[in-house]
From Swiss-Prot:
Gene3D superfamilies: Alpha-D-Glucose-1,6-Bisphosphate, subunit A, domain 3 (3.40.120.10), Alpha-D-phosphohexomutase, C-terminal domain (3.30.310.50). The gene is glmM. Belongs to the phosphohexose mutase family. Mg(2+) binds at S102, D243, D245, D247. PANTHER family: PHOSPHOGLUCOMUTASE (ALPHA-D-GLUCOSE-1,6-BISPHOSPHATE-DEPENDENT), PHOSPHOHEXOSE MUTASE. Activated by phosphorylation. InterPro entries: A-D-PHexomutase_a/b/a-I, A-D-PHexomutase_a/b/a-I/II/III, A-D-PHexomutase_a/b/a-II, A-D-PHexomutase_a/b/a-III, A-D-PHexomutase_C, A-D-PHexomutase_C_sf, A-D-PHexomutase_CS, Alpha-D-phosphohexomutase_SF. Keywords: Isomerase, Magnesium, Metal-binding, Phosphoprotein. This is Phosphoglucosamine mutase. Its cofactor is Mg(2+). It comes from Brucella melitensis biotype 1 (strain ATCC 23456 / CCUG 17765 / NCTC 10094 / 16M).
Length: 451
């Protein structure tokens, strides 16, 4: 069934434009409230948000929807996405909501939904919500005496800080470690510096003054240049780059070099395998993860299971097949021993634990394999289905033939933006670049002609 509202990570779009309007947000609250409320019992939703200005608008619309459906609402304020998932369980809520567009610019926003177990909702429930939104909502409203209440709660941010701190082994301290944290002017701007400082690190914080429109603006995990310069400038041991909702993380070593999610997963996989903590005989990643990671794991008799892009698909595969480590090259790292979704802070703490335990610099700990030359480019489209175009199909087939068995080609539409992502990797860098550029040119040409 075709989706109209939900993408790979909830509902997302430009604020005040379809589908990210107050009207639709209110209907989402009504539909979700009706599905998850417990008949004859008090039911509860928790709502968190990042630091986008439009978060206030969508928060109020969701509150109207949930309370109209008979649910009480706890408002958590600016807080990381993984904290919402954790607090959904901790506060015995029936549904958790995060208002965020993750790493996107401030003018975008989104709605992510978590069930009472802290996991993202299934495709079936999302389709049920869509069907309800498009119909008459009147039958789903609560009676006069059952309308819900809403209140803003204080202090729950500290529950999450304590939870994150407990994931660092008690025998390991961060004393003497100089850490620069790039908070992306987002949801992690309070929790990440506080947790690291309480664990003993010397913390230098950048991009921790959100104003509603500077989230992810030339900062955070998608723009780590400022962090690289800061780490080098203050001679820090490590830099930690979060994204707008703090569910992904990249590191910067003491030399100012970026360490991506593939390298971070390699560190955790090797460490946990050595201590018999790794489950499933390997890890789960997406089709975008580097071939070098797969070879690294194979050399250690560990497997790499690949899924479609999107941390929800990684988590689904982990749950179905018994893995406890998974993630994406972009920095979504899912450690199911601790969390139900990607968690930037907790993932960073696991890497710091390995470095402290081995008494080695981050550059030594996190350079586990030589990545195969890989190139990812995006091409913006103007609608239609360019991947079904004959010329585009022909270009893709030709590219696969040229790469042969020495590389991989992944082409997919973005689930959150009007983009086609083209990625190729292989041992021949020149060939990889040629293949990607040729496909980009054809898609651009055909998309323009169809506009």
């Amino acid at each position: 069934m075709t989706r109209k509202f939900f993408g790979t990570d909830g509902i997302r779009g430009q604020a005040n434009s379809f589908p990210m309007t107050p009207e639709i947000a209110m209907k989402v609250g009504m539909a979700v409230g009706y599905i998850f409320r417990r008949k004859g019992q008090a039911s509860r939703a928790v709502i968190g948000k990042d630091t986008r200005r439009s978060g206030y608008m969508l928060e109020n619309a969701l509150v109207a929807g949930f309370t109209a459906a008979g649910m009480d609402v706890f408002l958590l304020g600016p807080i990381p996405t993984p904290a919402v998932a954790m607090l959904c369980r901790s506060l015995r809520a029936d549904i958790g909501v995060m208002i965020s567009a993750s790493h996107n610019p401030f003018y975008d926003n989104g709605i992510k939904l978590f069930g009472p177990d802290g996991f993202k909702l299934s495709d079936q429930i999302e389709l049920q919500i869509e069907a309800m939104i498009e119909g008459d909502m009147t039958p789903f409203l609560a009676s006069h005496g059952d309308v819900g209440r809403a209140k803003r709660v204080d202090g729950d941010i500290y529950r999450y800080i304590e939870f994150a701190k407990r994931t660092l082994p008690r025998n390991i301290s961060l004393n003497g470690l100089r850490v620069v944290v790039d908070c992306a002017n987002g949801a992690g701007y309070k929790v990440a510096p506080a947790a690291l400082w309480e664990l003993g690190a010397e913390v230098i914080t950048i991009n921790n003054e959100p104003n509603g429109i500077n989230i992810n603006e030339d900062c955070g995990s998608t723009h780590p240049i400022g962090l690289m310069k800061k780490v080098h400038g203050v001679r820090a041991d490590v830099g930690i780059a979060l994204d707008g909702d703090a569910d992904r993380v990249l590191l910067v070593d003491e030399n100012g070099t970026v360490i991506d999610g593939d390298q971070l997963m390699a560190v955790i996989a090797e460490s946990w395998a050595a201590s018999n903590r790794l489950e499933g005989g390997g890890i789960v990643a997406t089709v975008m993860s580097n071939l070098g990671l797969e070879r690294f794991l194979a050399d250690r008799n560990l497997t790499l299971a690949r899924t479609k892009v999107g941390d929800r698909y990684v988590v689904e595969h982990m749950r179905e097949h018994g893995f406890n480590v998974g993630g994406e090259q972009s920095g979504h790292i899912v450690l199911s021993d601790f969390a139900t979704t990607g968690d930037g802070l907790i993932s960073a703490l696991q890497i710091l634990a390995v470095a402290q335990e081995q008494n080695k610099p981050i550059s030594d700990v996190c350079r586990k394999f030589q990545p195969v030359p890989q190139l990812l480019k995006n091409v913006r489209t103007t609608g239609g289905k360019p991947l079904e175009n004959k010329r585009v199909k022909s270009a893709i087939d030709e590219a696969k033939e040229r790469l042969g068995g020495q590389g991989r080609l992944v082409i997919r539409p973005s689930g959150t933006e009007p983009l086609i992502r083209v990625m190729a990797e292989g041992d021949d860098r020149g060939l990889v670049e040629k293949v990607v550029n040729d496909i980009i040119d054809v898609i651009s040409s055909e998309s323009s002609a169809a506009a």
